[in-house]
Amino acid sequence: MSSSSEYRFLTYINGTVVDYIEWRLPLQFIYSFEVGMMVTNFLEYVYTFYLLLRFRAMHSNLHILLLLYGGQYFFSMISRAVLLYFQFHDAESMNDPSFADLIYTANYTRTICLFVAFNMLPFLVFERCFATCFAGTYENDRHYWIPLLLISIMMPVCVFSAVAYINNWFSIYTHGILLIVLNIGGSLLLIIVTKCNIRLHNSYSTLEHHGLYSLSERFQVSENIKTCQWLSRIQGSILFFNVACVSLLVLENVSMNDKMVIVSNVSFNILCTIYAAVTPIIVIIYTPEWTRETIRLWHLIFLLSNTDQLDLRTTFGEEMNYSDKNIESKVYFDQLQRNLTEEAMKKSKKKHRSSSWNNSEHEIFL
């Protein structure tokens, strides 16, 4: 990391220091591993965006915030790739001013994107607070102004925090404490919102409040509980990675030992990459619609390719492969009609035999 009283890098290591302590070769190996993980993460996020755009597994307002949460990673990944390129090629030896401008742009982009990720959890919970306040109309009216309001508040805060961090306007302790407090506060607020919705839902069963709530309000409160429980399952990993990454960021900036600074920096970047890889997996696991689609695609791609194709045949061994679906449907219904007719004839014959037997018995008794 290169930092001074005027400018602070978030994810960059001074190559001169690396050469001095003779760590260039192991760091290049670690960077190669990070690049491989970033390629895997890119494919993972493309698939996650396919699920986000294909299936509406949550309210549209929460859906918009998740699109922003996942979308920032593409810009963060591109900027990190630029920094890694210059890290591999020893940017300190490049005297072209355009290289320096590109490094600064990548640094600003990555820092802003990471601050968006670090601040997202409380804003996801704020959306659930609005859903609780507007329980009667939240599903019908949508209230698209809510995510716009939250984003219009969050983005300036994240941009200002990133610029303040880079330009060293505040101490690293200020940034670290604020981010940790925001994330822990968001988790506590989620617990409170969940309990409020459960208490509100339980009050419906009492005779005292039975007629005070409409059917749409009851449905929305049930959806709030379901969504809050879903968010509670995934917020644990988000909280852990946010607090861990911020702690490493603080450790990196307060360490006086060059080796400790580099270890903290590398650990921070690897942890951010793992953070980006784990979060979509957890969301997919706890979202039933996404899980079913993932299982379906898994069977379609990996299992069916290893299974022998069996041709459909009639009871007489004739193949039933038809290029035209209309012909196939006609053959199916013709066979079905033939089977139904045969069963009806068998029942009719059986009934006729039974009737004949009864008549013969009657004649004997006479």
From Swiss-Prot:
It comes from the Eukaryota. The chain crosses the membrane at residues 33-53, 64-84, 111-131, 146-166, 172-192, 234-254, 266-286. It is a multi-pass membrane protein. GO terms for cellular component: membrane. The keyword Endoplasmic reticulum does not apply. It is found in: Membrane. Keywords: Membrane, Transmembrane, Transmembrane helix. Residues 344-366 are annotated as: Disordered. One of its GO terms (biological process) is sensory perception of chemical stimulus. InterPro entries: 7TM_GPCR_serpentine_rcpt_Sre, Serpentine_rcpt_epsilon. Belongs to the nematode receptor-like protein sre family. This is Serpentine receptor class epsilon-6. The lineage of its organism: Eukaryota, Metazoa, Ecdysozoa, Nematoda, Chromadorea. The gene is sre-6.
